[in-house]
Amino acid sequence: MELLKDKIKKEGRVTEDNILMVDSFLNHQMDVEFFNEVGKEFKDRFKNDQIDKILTIESTGIGLGIITAQYFDNVPVVFGKKIERLPRNKREEVFNSEVYSFTKKTIYNVVVDKKFIKPGEKILIVDDFLANACAVFGLIDVVKQAGAEVVGVGIVIEKGFQSGRAHLEDKGIRVESLVTIDKIEDGEVYFK
């Protein structure tokens, strides 16, 4: 997606430790016009698939999910909540998956209320970044617990130098990334 590459080149910044920051348009301040283009692109890539719901994870994924849903006949958007500890009295009410965050070096629970994903539903997962796929696997686990089906995973920015895609494809999961970064080196972003 050339628009996304241009946004990254113009508005993205690379920190001293080679981390790409896209907070000016994606994951802090959200560029709604750009998000609409993302939604259209995901629709184009999954146009031949039945999508009953979009599943994402808080917080950046919520905006992406809502706008993307408009291009899939306004299907509902469900988001996994990140919590440190699952209260005992909630365990029977939710689907829960433990996820390791490489960014924060901690384990958290992704929870979705059982009433929001039903057996047999066709689910499209969307998220802002794909690195090691830990968050995506947490969402896939939630979908499986519900007896639903993952149609595919839509990713805005894939870190192609990390193993997320390979892990997902090894499990037969379709991955559609709008842009793939080959490497980040000396403050520069290189695309595949």
UniProtKB/Swiss-Prot annotation:
Keyword check for Transferase: yes
Full protein name: Xanthine phosphoribosyltransferase 2
Enzyme class: transferase
Function recorded in the entry: Converts the preformed base xanthine, a product of nucleic acid breakdown, to xanthosine 5'-monophosphate (XMP), so it can be reused for RNA or DNA synthesis.
Listed pathway(s): Purine metabolism; XMP biosynthesis via salvage pathway; XMP from xanthine: step 1/1
Locations listed in the record: Cytoplasm
One GO-annotated biological process of the protein: purine ribonucleoside salvage
Residues where 5-phospho-alpha-D-ribose 1-diphosphate binds: A131, N132, A133, C134, A135
GO CC annotations, alphabetized: cytoplasm
Gene, per the UniProt record: xpt2
